[in-house]
Protein backbone atom coordinates (compact mmCIF):
# COMPACT_ATOMS: atom_id res chain seq x y z
CA UNK A 1 0.00 0.00 0.00
CA UNK A 2 1.37 3.41 -0.99
CA UNK A 3 2.17 5.97 1.68
CA UNK A 4 -0.28 8.93 1.44
CA UNK A 5 2.48 11.24 2.66
CA UNK A 6 4.78 10.15 -0.18
CA UNK A 7 2.01 10.65 -2.73
CA UNK A 8 1.36 14.16 -1.48
CA UNK A 9 5.05 15.04 -1.50
CA UNK A 10 5.19 13.88 -5.12
CA UNK A 11 2.26 16.16 -5.93
CA UNK A 12 4.05 19.03 -4.20
CA UNK A 13 7.27 18.37 -6.09
CA UNK A 14 5.46 17.99 -9.42
CA UNK A 15 3.76 21.33 -8.75
CA UNK A 16 7.16 22.91 -8.10
CA UNK A 17 8.69 21.36 -11.25
CA UNK A 18 5.80 22.70 -13.34
CA UNK A 19 6.33 26.12 -11.77
CA UNK A 20 10.05 26.12 -12.61
CA UNK A 21 9.34 25.04 -16.20
CA UNK A 22 6.80 27.83 -16.49
CA UNK A 23 9.39 30.35 -15.26
CA UNK A 24 11.76 29.27 -18.03
CA UNK A 25 8.97 29.69 -20.58
CA UNK A 26 8.06 33.17 -19.31
CA UNK A 27 11.72 34.19 -19.40
CA UNK A 28 11.84 33.35 -23.10
CA UNK A 29 8.63 35.29 -23.78
CA UNK A 30 9.74 38.35 -21.82
CA UNK A 31 13.21 38.37 -23.39
CA UNK A 32 11.69 38.14 -26.85
CA UNK A 33 9.30 41.03 -26.21
CA UNK A 34 12.10 43.16 -24.78
CA UNK A 35 14.86 42.30 -27.28
CA UNK A 36 12.68 42.93 -30.33
CA UNK A 37 11.99 46.46 -29.14
CA UNK A 38 8.32 45.76 -28.61
CA UNK A 39 6.60 49.11 -28.17
CA UNK A 40 3.10 47.75 -27.80
CA UNK A 41 2.29 48.30 -24.13
CA UNK A 42 -0.78 46.10 -24.46
CA UNK A 43 1.36 43.11 -25.43
CA UNK A 44 3.76 43.76 -22.56
CA UNK A 45 0.86 44.23 -20.16
CA UNK A 46 -0.62 40.90 -21.27
CA UNK A 47 2.70 39.19 -20.49
CA UNK A 48 2.91 40.95 -17.14
CA UNK A 49 -0.65 40.02 -16.18
CA UNK A 50 0.05 36.43 -17.22
CA UNK A 51 3.16 36.31 -15.01
CA UNK A 52 1.22 37.66 -12.02
CA UNK A 53 -1.60 35.20 -12.64
CA UNK A 54 0.95 32.37 -12.83
CA UNK A 55 2.11 33.12 -9.31
CA UNK A 56 -1.45 33.35 -8.03
CA UNK A 57 -2.22 29.91 -9.49
CA UNK A 58 0.97 28.47 -8.00
CA UNK A 59 0.15 29.90 -4.57
CA UNK A 60 -3.36 28.42 -4.75
CA UNK A 61 -1.98 24.97 -5.58
CA UNK A 62 0.56 25.24 -2.75
CA UNK A 63 -2.26 26.11 -0.37
CA UNK A 64 -4.24 23.05 -1.44
CA UNK A 65 -1.23 20.73 -1.12
CA UNK A 66 -0.16 22.14 2.26
CA UNK A 67 -3.37 21.48 4.18
CA UNK A 68 -2.11 18.18 5.62
CA UNK A 69 1.66 18.34 5.12
CA UNK A 70 2.78 21.95 5.17
CA UNK A 71 6.22 21.24 6.67
CA UNK A 72 7.44 20.01 3.27
CA UNK A 73 7.31 23.61 2.05
CA UNK A 74 9.51 24.97 4.83
CA UNK A 75 12.46 22.71 3.91
CA UNK A 76 11.61 21.23 0.50
CA UNK A 77 13.55 18.15 -0.56
CA UNK A 78 13.35 19.40 -4.16
CA UNK A 79 15.30 22.54 -3.27
CA UNK A 80 19.05 22.73 -2.98
CA UNK A 81 20.62 23.35 0.43
CA UNK A 82 21.47 26.89 -0.69
CA UNK A 83 17.86 27.64 -1.54
CA UNK A 84 16.56 26.20 1.73
CA UNK A 85 19.05 28.31 3.67
CA UNK A 86 17.54 31.41 2.05
CA UNK A 87 13.87 30.48 2.54
CA UNK A 88 11.45 32.70 4.42
CA UNK A 89 8.06 31.12 5.12
CA UNK A 90 8.39 28.62 2.30
CA UNK A 91 9.60 31.13 -0.29
CA UNK A 92 11.49 34.35 -0.80
CA UNK A 93 11.02 37.43 1.34
CA UNK A 94 8.56 39.83 -0.30
CA UNK A 95 10.92 42.70 0.53
CA UNK A 96 13.55 41.02 -1.66
CA UNK A 97 11.40 41.98 -4.66
CA UNK A 98 11.94 45.61 -3.73
CA UNK A 99 15.65 45.08 -3.12
CA UNK A 100 15.81 43.72 -6.67
CA UNK A 101 14.28 46.94 -8.00
CA UNK A 102 16.88 48.99 -6.10
CA UNK A 103 19.70 46.74 -7.33
CA UNK A 104 18.62 47.01 -10.97
CA UNK A 105 18.13 50.76 -10.72
CA UNK A 106 21.57 51.32 -9.18
CA UNK A 107 23.35 48.92 -11.52
CA UNK A 108 21.86 50.37 -14.69
CA UNK A 109 22.42 53.96 -13.58
CA UNK A 110 26.08 53.15 -12.93
CA UNK A 111 26.29 51.35 -16.27
CA UNK A 112 24.94 54.34 -18.16
CA UNK A 113 27.24 56.79 -16.41
CA UNK A 114 30.22 54.54 -17.14
CA UNK A 115 29.24 54.44 -20.81
CA UNK A 116 28.82 58.20 -20.81
CA UNK A 117 32.32 58.85 -19.48
CA UNK A 118 34.11 56.04 -21.34
CA UNK A 119 32.47 56.21 -24.73
CA UNK A 120 34.86 58.73 -26.26
CA UNK A 121 34.19 57.60 -29.83
CA UNK A 122 30.79 59.28 -29.91
CA UNK A 123 29.91 62.92 -29.81
CA UNK A 124 28.70 64.60 -26.64
CA UNK A 125 25.05 64.60 -27.70
CA UNK A 126 25.12 60.84 -28.21
CA UNK A 127 26.77 60.32 -24.83
CA UNK A 128 24.29 62.57 -23.11
CA UNK A 129 21.36 60.72 -24.65
CA UNK A 130 22.78 57.44 -23.43
CA UNK A 131 23.29 58.79 -19.91
CA UNK A 132 19.75 60.10 -19.82
CA UNK A 133 18.39 56.73 -20.84
CA UNK A 134 17.40 57.56 -24.38
CA UNK A 135 18.21 54.10 -25.69
CA UNK A 136 17.17 52.90 -29.11
CA UNK A 137 13.57 51.90 -29.10
CA UNK A 138 13.28 53.00 -25.49
CA UNK A 139 12.91 49.39 -24.49
CA UNK A 140 14.14 47.13 -21.70
CA UNK A 141 17.27 45.12 -21.31
CA UNK A 142 17.29 46.42 -17.73
CA UNK A 143 18.05 50.00 -18.77
CA UNK A 144 14.47 51.05 -18.08
CA UNK A 145 15.00 50.64 -14.33
CA UNK A 146 17.42 53.58 -14.27
CA UNK A 147 14.56 55.73 -15.55
CA UNK A 148 12.63 55.48 -12.27
CA UNK A 149 11.16 58.84 -11.37
CA UNK A 150 11.29 60.47 -7.95
CA UNK A 151 7.59 59.70 -7.51
CA UNK A 152 8.13 56.03 -8.35
CA UNK A 153 11.06 55.77 -5.93
CA UNK A 154 8.98 57.38 -3.19
CA UNK A 155 6.15 54.88 -3.72
CA UNK A 156 8.58 51.95 -3.80
CA UNK A 157 10.25 53.10 -0.59
CA UNK A 158 6.85 53.48 1.07
CA UNK A 159 5.91 49.97 -0.07
CA UNK A 160 9.25 48.67 1.24
CA UNK A 161 8.54 49.97 4.75
CA UNK A 162 5.02 48.49 4.81
CA UNK A 163 6.24 45.16 3.45
CA UNK A 164 8.99 44.82 6.06
CA UNK A 165 6.46 45.62 8.78
CA UNK A 166 4.12 42.89 7.48
CA UNK A 167 7.04 40.45 7.26
CA UNK A 168 7.97 41.13 10.87
CA UNK A 169 4.43 40.36 12.02
CA UNK A 170 4.46 36.99 10.25
CA UNK A 171 7.93 36.24 11.61
CA UNK A 172 6.64 36.80 15.15
CA UNK A 173 3.77 34.37 14.52
CA UNK A 174 6.25 31.82 13.19
CA UNK A 175 8.47 32.24 16.26
CA UNK A 176 5.48 31.69 18.53
CA UNK A 177 4.54 28.48 16.69
CA UNK A 178 8.11 27.21 16.97
CA UNK A 179 8.15 27.93 20.70
CA UNK A 180 4.93 25.94 21.12
CA UNK A 181 6.82 22.73 20.31
CA UNK A 182 8.81 23.19 23.54
CA UNK A 183 5.61 23.43 25.59
CA UNK A 184 2.84 21.10 26.75
CA UNK A 185 1.97 18.51 25.50
CA UNK A 186 4.85 17.89 23.06
CA UNK A 187 7.85 18.60 25.30
CA UNK A 188 6.33 16.93 28.37
CA UNK A 189 5.43 13.78 26.44
CA UNK A 190 8.96 13.60 25.00
CA UNK A 191 10.42 13.74 28.52
CA UNK A 192 8.23 11.07 30.12
CA UNK A 193 8.18 8.53 27.28
CA UNK A 194 10.46 5.57 27.97
CA UNK A 195 10.97 4.98 24.26
CA UNK A 196 12.10 8.09 22.41
CA UNK A 197 9.67 8.95 19.63
CA UNK A 198 7.04 6.51 20.86
CA UNK A 199 3.63 7.16 19.32
CA UNK A 200 1.31 9.35 21.35
CA UNK A 201 -2.21 10.33 20.31
CA UNK A 202 -2.10 13.66 22.15
CA UNK A 203 1.25 14.56 20.62
CA UNK A 204 0.08 13.60 17.14
CA UNK A 205 -2.94 15.86 17.52
CA UNK A 206 -0.71 18.70 18.70
CA UNK A 207 1.68 18.21 15.77
CA UNK A 208 -1.25 18.05 13.34
CA UNK A 209 -2.46 21.37 14.75
CA UNK A 210 1.05 22.80 14.46
CA UNK A 211 1.27 21.67 10.83
CA UNK A 212 -2.13 23.19 10.12
CA UNK A 213 -1.08 26.50 11.66
CA UNK A 214 2.15 26.49 9.65
CA UNK A 215 0.08 25.86 6.53
CA UNK A 216 -1.98 28.93 7.34
CA UNK A 217 1.23 30.90 7.78
CA UNK A 218 2.42 29.76 4.35
CA UNK A 219 -0.82 31.00 2.81
CA UNK A 220 -0.45 34.40 4.49
CA UNK A 221 3.18 34.65 3.35
CA UNK A 222 2.17 33.84 -0.22
CA UNK A 223 -0.55 36.50 -0.03
CA UNK A 224 2.06 39.05 1.03
CA UNK A 225 4.36 37.95 -1.78
CA UNK A 226 1.49 38.30 -4.27
CA UNK A 227 0.43 41.69 -2.91
CA UNK A 228 3.97 43.06 -2.97
CA UNK A 229 4.61 41.79 -6.49
CA UNK A 230 1.36 43.29 -7.77
CA UNK A 231 1.99 46.68 -6.14
CA UNK A 232 5.52 46.89 -7.54
CA UNK A 233 4.23 46.18 -11.04
CA UNK A 234 1.52 48.83 -10.58
CA UNK A 235 4.19 51.43 -9.73
CA UNK A 236 6.41 50.59 -12.71
CA UNK A 237 5.80 51.28 -16.38
CA UNK A 238 5.08 48.33 -18.66
CA UNK A 239 8.70 48.19 -19.86
CA UNK A 240 10.07 48.50 -16.33
CA UNK A 241 7.71 45.81 -15.05
CA UNK A 242 8.79 43.46 -17.85
CA UNK A 243 12.46 44.05 -16.98
CA UNK A 244 11.74 43.53 -13.28
CA UNK A 245 9.84 40.28 -13.80
CA UNK A 246 12.52 38.99 -16.16
CA UNK A 247 15.23 39.74 -13.59
CA UNK A 248 13.26 38.05 -10.81
CA UNK A 249 12.62 34.88 -12.80
CA UNK A 250 16.25 34.65 -13.94
CA UNK A 251 17.43 35.08 -10.35
CA UNK A 252 15.04 32.35 -9.16
CA UNK A 253 16.27 29.82 -11.71
CA UNK A 254 19.90 30.88 -11.31
CA UNK A 255 19.85 30.29 -7.54
CA UNK A 256 18.59 26.76 -8.15
CA UNK A 257 21.36 26.05 -10.67
CA UNK A 258 24.05 27.65 -8.50
CA UNK A 259 22.86 25.57 -5.57
CA UNK A 260 23.13 22.37 -7.62
CA UNK A 261 26.61 23.32 -8.81
CA UNK A 262 27.81 23.99 -5.27
CA UNK A 263 26.43 20.66 -4.05
CA UNK A 264 28.07 18.86 -6.95
CA UNK A 265 31.45 20.44 -6.12
CA UNK A 266 31.09 19.51 -2.45
CA UNK A 267 30.22 15.94 -3.41
CA UNK A 268 33.30 15.68 -5.62
CA UNK A 269 35.52 17.24 -2.93
CA UNK A 270 34.31 14.73 -0.35
CA UNK A 271 35.15 11.80 -2.59
CA UNK A 272 31.54 10.95 -3.37
CA UNK A 273 30.28 10.88 0.23
CA UNK A 274 27.07 12.91 0.03
CA UNK A 275 26.52 12.79 3.78
CA UNK A 276 23.05 11.40 3.25
CA UNK A 277 21.91 14.05 0.78
CA UNK A 278 19.85 12.92 -2.16
CA UNK A 279 21.24 13.67 -5.60
CA UNK A 280 19.10 16.48 -7.04
CA UNK A 281 17.93 16.64 -10.59
From Swiss-Prot:
InterPro entries: Seed_Dev/Stress_Resp_Reg, TGA_domain
Observed effect of gene inactivation: No germination phenotype.
Signal peptide: none
Ranges in coiled-coil conformation: none
GO biological process, alphabetically ordered: DNA-templated transcription
GO MF entry, a single one: sequence-specific DNA binding
Chain residue ranges for the region called Disordered: 262-281
Domain DOG1: 9-265
PANTHER family noted in UniProt: DOG1 DOMAIN-CONTAINING PROTEIN, PROTEIN DOG1-LIKE 1
UniProt-recorded name of the protein: Protein DOG1-like 1
Amino acid sequence: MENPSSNLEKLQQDCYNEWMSLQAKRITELKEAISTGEKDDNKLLDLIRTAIRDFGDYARKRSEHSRRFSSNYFAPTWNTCLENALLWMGGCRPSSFIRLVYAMCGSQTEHRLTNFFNNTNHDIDSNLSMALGETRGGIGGGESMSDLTAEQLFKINELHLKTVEAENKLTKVSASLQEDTADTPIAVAAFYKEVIGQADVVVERALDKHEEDMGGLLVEADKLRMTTLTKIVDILTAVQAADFLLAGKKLHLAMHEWGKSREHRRLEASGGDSGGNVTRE
